[in-house]
UniProtKB/Swiss-Prot annotation:
Name of the gene: pdxH
Binding locations of substrate: K58, Y115, R119, S123, R183, L184, H185
Keyword DNA repair: no
Stated name of the protein: Pyridoxine/pyridoxamine 5'-phosphate oxidase
Cofactor dependence: FMN
An example molecular function term from Gene Ontology annotations: pyridoxamine phosphate oxidase activity
Pathway assigned to this chain's UniProt record: Cofactor metabolism; pyridoxal 5'-phosphate salvage; pyridoxal 5'-phosphate from pyridoxamine 5'-phosphate: step 1/1; Cofactor metabolism; pyridoxal 5'-phosphate salvage; pyridoxal 5'-phosphate from pyridoxine 5'-phosphate: step 1/1
Enzyme class name: oxidoreductase
Organism: Sinorhizobium fredii (strain NBRC 101917 / NGR234)
Length: 206
């Protein structure tokens, strides 16, 4: 399926954003070569300077968009401080983009435990071994830490570190964009004043 074969005009008739996002994500899973769930995550530091990096979306529903990280990392510290974030998905093969922003909440311990158990064993070891976002003296130091935690957790389940969990963005704004000829793109934004409120749909100039 190519971008031209998609029923791109129909998305402007959608009444709410979550089912539309689900449809677009499924299209991306069929067309994007690598990581269709990759998303740019923007946060802000104490000086008001933005930071952005790619993360992987690990779940979404009508409550929000979920990803996981080390809370002691730069993004973890910034999210714990401001409790606000923005995301941008860009699916180049489909010529589509989705932007969203809103307040952030921590997922439940049960959600974090369930996802942590689903990760490959090596990734769970890595969560213990990596002091994310802090200076690393050498690659050998990281590999040594991996070896030490591998030995420590050689038998049985690997517990989730207390500093490792997930965040959920509860969007108050979600914008859908699709490329059109002559840069006359389609843009539709769904807005609500609070995460629990109803959606207002606004068509935007490109």
């Amino acid at each position: 399926m190519t971008a031209n074969e998609l029923t791109t005009g129909d998305f402007t008739d959608a009444d709410e954003p979550f089912s539309l996002f689900g449809t677009w994500l499924k299209d991306a899973e069929k067309n994007e070569v690598n990581d269709p769930n990759a998303v740019a995550l923007a946060t802000v530091d104490p000086d008001g300077l933005p930071n952005v990096r790619m993360v992987l979306l690990k779940g979404f529903d009508e409550h929000g968009f979920v990803f996981y990280t080390n809370f002691e990392s730069q993004k973890g510290q910034e999210l714990l401080s401001t409790r606000k974030a923005a995301m941008c998905f860009h699916w180049k093969s489909l010529r589509r983009q989705v932007r969203l922003r809103g307040p952030v909440e921590i997922v439940t311990a049960e959600e974090a435990d369930e996802y942590f158990r689903s990760r490959p064993r090596g990734s769970r070891i890595g969560a213990w071994a990596s002091k994310q976002s802090r200076p690393l003296e050498s690659r050998f130091a990281l590999e040594k830490a991996v070896a030490e935690f591998t030995a420590r957790h050689a038998i049985g389940e690997i517990p989730r570190p207390e500093y490792w969990s997930g965040f959920r963005i509860r969007p108050t704004s979600i914008e859908f964009w699709h490329d059109r000829p002559f840069r006359l793109h389609d843009r539709v934004e769904f807005r609500r004043p609070v995460p629990e409120g109803g959606w207002e749909k606004v068509r935007m100039y490109p």
